[in-house]
Amino acid sequence: MSDAQDDHAPDGWIRQDAERTRRAIRLPRDDDDKYTRGVLGVRTGSDRYPGAAVLGVEAAARTGVGMIRYLGPAGASASVLARRPEVVTADGRVQAWLVGSGMDQAHRDDAATDAITAALRQGLPAVVDAGALDLVGRATGPVVVTPHFRELSRLLDGAGIEASAEQIAADAPGWAERAAQELGVCVLLKGATTYVVGGGTRIAVRAGTPWLATAGSGDVLGGVLGSLVAGASARIPDAADPLAVLADVAAAAAWLHGRAGDIASGGGPITALDVAEAMPRAVREALEGSGA
């Protein structure tokens, strides 16, 4: 089955639900500090798209990460701090990376390219989005990429595989599988149904209102995913299948993103920031086993 609009998972695929999402969320313990709860390094945003940095950081903070280090451009950094003063903008230890949101490969300067490359070569789990997708081959640690159809088409083209956005849309689960196999990464392919493939795991996520098709929605998803990956970072390196762990976490992020969209919408229009602000309730519903 290849209809991306169907409400059911294709044969052989897992359908994401609140219980699976709950298991991917790292709960704080009595002996935790901000470091043990996960530190997310963030290199997102640009002079052209500074808001993407704000949205991703906001979403990560509201999903429950212990600490965020934002290391993007100065203008975006000022906007991030104005919204979230608890964010740290000094370099230092991180346990996972979120890179690429709010960047455009065509306008990315050498400094940004070098900084993202250095992050990806640390061997840490990384969420690679948008304007950093062309750099995924430089990563030395486990990676989850978060393309939409057009971005996946460009990513595959860079690997010598021709597939138009229309072809990918016509068989989204099949192309998500092929991309994961060819690129050696976990793939979260965004759409009305989101398809996640990593290692031996295939998950379909059908959650959220069509109002989620709004500017900045993907930046919020990146922040949610970055937060969950940072929380899971201690168990990823020693896992028998690190990409399968990333797939479980990525599917949970997609479910939370969709549920937060439903909560924020209430049947009406929403903005990306509305979705980020609804994230604590979406997390709570997952932990309680409720929600869609």
Which residues fall in each region the model found?
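Small-residue (G/A/S/T)-rich helix-start motifs and N-terminal tracts that mark the onset
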Residues: 1-130, 134-141, 149, 154-292
